[in-house]
Design a protein with these regions (language model features):
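N-terminal intrinsically disordered, acidic low-complexity segments at the extreme N-terminus
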Residues: 1-12
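All-alpha RGS (Regulator of G-protein Signaling) helical domain and cognate RGS-like helical scaffolds
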Residues: 2, 18-218
Length: 218
């Protein structure tokens, strides 16, 4: 191509008064990125607000600690029912209960580790409950069996194991449901709420099953 032709062809450029496609595209990208950054900042702020780590005196920490201890006694009683019960239905419910509640203990203890809190706290048990429920003089939470009752269950045999287990576990589960309800009144932390709801539902179901077995076993 001759130099004359090259000189005759207008140089390709973008008129500042009429932005070309490349300028418009860059502008749109800039606006989109700005919007995304603002959206991300708002989402992060909201997340930090709702996902704040529970502290030492929080209801979530109190629930995790107290329900772990409450569940631990239920697991002990359930394993005795599984090992020594006479009715196959009692042994089965004991087995299922021990697995479920031991798994929930694992979840709650993991939360405490993630929140950098100790398994036990300095506050009295149940102080986090909104209705002011307190432990009894022996330090037992609602529904928990006394040491003497646990000893009786250890020493019982056959049908007596079934009867003792049913009576003690119904009371124990009623206390556990009450604790779960207390947490649900004051917490909106998703994982804690989910576990409390699942625990409440499972215990209510087992209370109904135990009451049917109580009638069947006299």
């Amino acid at each position: 191509m001759s130099s004359a032709v090259q000189e005759a062809r207008p140089a390709e450029r973008t008129d500042p008064a009429r932005p070309g496609r490349s300028v418009r595209t860059l502008r749109y990208l800039t606006l989109a990125l700005t919007a995304l950054l603002l959206l991300g900042a708002g989402w992060t702020a909201a997340t930090l607000t709702t996902d704040r780590t529970p502290g030492e005196e929080s209801a979530e920490a109190g629930f995790a600690r107290d329900m772990s201890r409450h569940h631990a006694q239920a697991v002990e009683m359930a394993m005795l029912a599984y090992a020594k019960g006479q009715d196959p239905a009692i042994r089965q419910i004991g087995y299922d209960m021990a697995l479920t509640q031991q798994a929930q203990i694992g979840h709650m203890q993991r939360w405490l580790q993630e929140w950098e809190l100790l398994p036990t706290g300095s506050r009295p048990a149940m102080e986090w409950m909104p209705d002011g429920v307190r432990v009894d003089q022996d330090g037992l939470m609602p529904g928990m069996a006394t040491r003497e009752e646990i000893t009786q269950l250890h020493e019982a045999q056959g049908a007596e194991v079934d009867r003792l287990f049913i009576r003690l576990m119904i009371d124990h589960h009623l206390g556990g449901v009450h604790m779960a309800d207390g947490l649900l009144k004051v917490s909106d932390r998703p994982e804690v709420v989910r576990l409390a709801q699942a625990s409440k539902q499972a215990q209510q179901k087992e209370i109904n099953e135990l009451r049917k077995l109580e009638l069947a076993n006299g």
